[in-house]
Swiss-Prot record:
<feature type="compositionally biased region" description="Acidic residues">
    <location>
        <begin position="49"/>
        <end position="66"/>
    </location>
</feature>
<dbReference type="InterPro" id="IPR004791">
    <property type="entry name" value="UvrC"/>
</dbReference>
<keyword id="KW-0227">DNA damage</keyword>
<dbReference type="Pfam" id="PF08459">
    <property type="entry name" value="UvrC_RNaseH_dom"/>
</dbReference>
<comment type="function">
    <text>The UvrABC repair system catalyzes the recognition and processing of DNA lesions. UvrC both incises the 5' and 3' sides of the lesion. The N-terminal half is responsible for the 3' incision and the C-terminal half is responsible for the 5' incision.</text>
</comment>
<dbReference type="InterPro" id="IPR036876">
    <property type="entry name" value="UVR_dom_sf"/>
</dbReference>
<dbReference type="GO" id="GO:0009432">
    <property type="term" value="P:SOS response"/>
</dbReference>
<protein>
    <recommendedName>
        <fullName>UvrABC system protein C</fullName>
    </recommendedName>
</protein>
<dbReference type="Pfam" id="PF02151">
    <property type="entry name" value="UVR"/>
</dbReference>
<dbReference type="GO" id="GO:0005737">
    <property type="term" value="C:cytoplasm"/>
</dbReference>
<keyword id="KW-0234">DNA repair</keyword>
<dbReference type="InterPro" id="IPR000305">
    <property type="entry name" value="GIY-YIG_endonuc"/>
</dbReference>
<keyword id="KW-0963">Cytoplasm</keyword>
<comment type="subunit">
    <text>Interacts with UvrB in an incision complex.</text>
</comment>
<dbReference type="InterPro" id="IPR047296">
    <property type="entry name" value="GIY-YIG_UvrC_Cho"/>
</dbReference>
<dbReference type="InterPro" id="IPR001162">
    <property type="entry name" value="UvrC_RNase_H_dom"/>
</dbReference>
<feature type="domain" description="GIY-YIG">
    <location>
        <begin position="92"/>
        <end position="170"/>
    </location>
</feature>
Length: 704
């Protein structure tokens, strides 16, 4: 398994706690009021450095004196001095505070019921755990934002953590929105479809599902069971005859009156009931209808009901464990090992298991399982509606406050609990087993990846083990829809949230000039990097957040999909922006007949390298190259499909209006024409064997 998200690069090296720090007084605190609830759209909280237990914090009158740090004072003294200045201006009301370093990178975001007392606890000269002491030693400034309530502070804290990604907070990674199933209600013939993002379209939403694959499989089975349409409204309105889905019994054909309004409405109601958890009643109804049709010797109708029942059984067989007493809940379980944490999340809705996903949050090794889990759950519901019940494997701090915040967000009561017995405890135990197994696989993959990177450095003679590898490739068909792409890999595997595609823009580019395309891609990528550092980002640029559009991070190794010619084009591109020999380049040429295992490696000013076909380093390089190829081909096909949709069939030589009409009448949609084989195309009236081949090649041309 290659884990998608990657841990952001480490911040600048920390100064030792007993050495001098940079000069300069720390600015005073910023006590701006919060902008209002409309700006607090997150529903979570992160770890507080300490408890809000007032017995642990100094009284207000005992706040530290804000004496300026003496010249040559150590980092701890400078940090405490900066915090003491902030304490003098900090409010005694709820709020959120941010610790900043000399480069104004946010080190930590926290919230407190009494901000003044919380900040005063950091300024104590003794009693800090190592993690907090390290943070204080790097702090030169503190910013404070006041809020009306502690709940509002909790929500704002989580929002800022997700935006700023401070290194001393627990950070949720791979926070991709979850897919839902939507049955629309804004058309007389409702549509079923997969949905991500804001739930703004009228209809019933069912989810979340753990993956898009789970949603797609469920929708396909639901179409077989309930014959609900999945086409767009515009396609629906343009039909004069049923499409292919009607022919294969995955749609009832409401577009052309194959089913009347009451009949289709009943199908939609049954689908809604099934997704709402009333699956037993729906199956009993279908079984009764099947028996009735069979008794009346309507065997074709009985077979249809039989197939619908089989489709429902297929859905439930994919869901695995389905609870008997839990209607709606999310289950969180954490396991820690080797300084890593894994949180496994299971989703149960309408009494059905809708999947699970493993997360690997970034956290300091000193965090306990309860601390990591509390911060994770808090951030998890930033852009997701919470269920009525949240089951946890560990007790977390401020569970009641978090439940209140989620209640405000969701508009219904939210309960957070650690079950002690019964089926709920079994669900948590099952999730914890999955977390332990997922972390075991993660650790094994990480160790393997580390060894591969070390061996790669040895094989290529690199000065150090690469921590960031960028791989470049481009794709086109005779110069059309030309696109370049960059993929990124590191110790944690592929870093997919840093992949980038580059639509080729150069005017006057010779169609199919791969070298010129590569030059353009590399110049655009590295000009951004040079510009970001020239603007004064310095080390901050190297530590930029992975979701930054420009991805201003220096690679340790750049791999080019191509031989000596592509490598020289890459060197020329970098030389043109003053980066001659500042970036390590590697060209990977395919073997004879494109045989895997016979690749040749090229480094600048060195002889070509040929590795044994079974060499793990060669296999690793192949995997990197193939991932870049997969990504760029996908990007190219997306552009090509967009052009095909806009142009339709008119672009195919020899296909005029008559043949176009015949194809659409036979297949129903452009998508079905694209899927058809040459033999299927040849069955259409007026389409010769030569025309069928031409149509097939138009849709299936292989990009370069």
């Amino acid at each position: 398994m290659i884990h998608d998200p990657a841990e952001p690069p480490a911040a600048a090296a920390e100064p030792p706690l007993d050495t001098a720090s940079p000069d300069g007084a720390a600015p005073v605190a910023d006590t701006r009021p919060a902008a209002g609830n409309q700006d607090i759209d997150a529903a979570t909280a992160s770890l507080a450095v300490e408890e809000d237990d007032e017995a642990r914090l100094p009284e207000v009158e005992d706040e530290p004196e804000a004496e300026p740090a003496q010249a040559g004072a150590g980092p701890m003294a400078v940090g405490r001095s900066a915090i003491a200045r902030a304490v003098r201006l900090a409010p005694t009301s709820p709020g959120v505070y941010r610790m900043l370093n000399a480069e104004r990178d946010v080190l930590y975001v926290g919230k407190a019921k009494n901000v003044k007392k919380r900040l005063a606890s950091y300024a104590r000269p003794t009693g800090q755990v190592l993690r907090i002491a390290r943070m204080i030693a790097l702090t030169v400034e503190v910013e404070v934002i006041s809020t009306t309530t502690e709940t509002e502070a909790l929500l704002l804290e989580a929002n800022l953590i997700k935006q700023l990604r401070p290194r001393f907070n627990v950070q949720l990674r791979d926070d991709k929105s979850f897919p839902y199933i939507l049955i629309t209600s804004d058309h007389w013939a409702p549509q079923i479809l997969k949905h991500r993002g804001a739930q703004s379209r009228p209809g019933r939403y069912f989810g979340p599902f753990a993956s898009a694959g789970a949603v797609n499989r469920t929708i396909t089975a639901l179409q077989r069971a309930f014959l609900v349409r999945s086409c767009t409204d515009s396609f629906f309105e343009s039909r004069t005859r049923p499409c292919l889905l009607y022919q294969i019994r995955r749609c009832a054909g409401p577009c052309t009156g194959e089913v009347d309004f009451p009949g289709y409405s009943e199908l939609v109601r049954e689908a809604t009931d099934f997704l709402s958890g009333r699956s037993r009643a729906v199956k009993e109804l279908l079984a009764a209808e099947m028996e009735k049709a069979s008794g009346e010797l309507e065997f074709e109708t009985a077979a249809l009901y039989r197939d619908r029942l089989a489709a429902l059984s297929a859905i439930q067989s994919q869901q695995g464990i389905n609870p008997r007493t839990v209607e709606e809940a999310d289950v969180f379980a954490i396991h820690q090992d080797g300084g890593y944490s894994c949180v496994e999340v299971f989703f149960f809705r309408t009494g059905q298991n809708w999947g699970n996903r493993a997360y690997f949050p970034r956290a300091e090794k000193s965090f306990t399982p309860a601390e990591v889990l509390g911060a994770f759950v808090a951030q998890f519901y930033d852009d997701k509606p919470p269920p009525k019940l949240i089951l946890l494997s560990h007790e977390i701090e401020e569970a009641e406050l978090l439940a209140d915040a989620l209640c405000v967000k969701a508009g219904h009561k939210v309960e957070i609990t650690v079950p002690k017995r019964g089926e709920k405890k079994e669900l948590v135990a099952h999730a914890q087993t999955n977390a332990r197994e997922a972390l075991g696989r993660k650790l094994a993959d990480t160790a393997t990846q580390a060894r591969l990177l070390e061996n790669l450095a040895t094989t290529l003679g690199l000065p150090k083990t690469p921590q960031r590898i960028e791989v470049y490739d481009n794709s086109h068909i005779q110069g059309t829809n030309a696109v370049g792409a960059m993929i990124v890999a590191g110790p944690d595997g592929f870093i997919k949230n840093q992949y980038r595609k580059f639509n080729i823009r150069s005017e006057g580019l010779t169609p199919g000039d791969d070298y010129a395309m590569m030059r353009e891609v590399l110049q655009r990528r590295f000009k951004r990097l040079v510009t970001s550092q020239a603007e004064g980002d310095g080390e901050a640029a190297a530590k930029a957040k992975p979701k930054d559009d420009d991805v201003p991070q220096w690679p340790d190794l750049v791999i080019i999909d191509g031989g000596r010619g592509q490598l020289n084009a890459a060197r020329e591109a970098l030389s043109g922006i003053g980066l001659t020999d500042q970036v390590t380049l590697l060209g990977v040429a395919k073997g004879p007949d494109r045989d895997a295992g016979r690749e040749t490696l090229f480094l600048p000013d060195r002889d070509a390298i040929k590795l044994e076909p079974r060499d793990p380093v060669l296999y690793f390089i192949q995997r990197l190259r193939d991932e870049a190829h997969r990504f760029v081909i996908g990007s190219h096909r997306t552009l090509r499909k967009k052009d095909i949709r806009e142009a339709g069939l008119q672009e195919i030589p020899g296909i005029g209006p008559t043949r176009k009409r015949a194809l659409l009448l036979h297949f129903g949609t452009l998508k079905e024409i694209e899927r058809a084989s040459i033999a299927d195309l040849g069955k259409v009236p007026g389409i010769s064997a030569e025309s069928a081949k031409r149509i097939f090649e138009f849709f299936h041309a292989r990009p370069d």
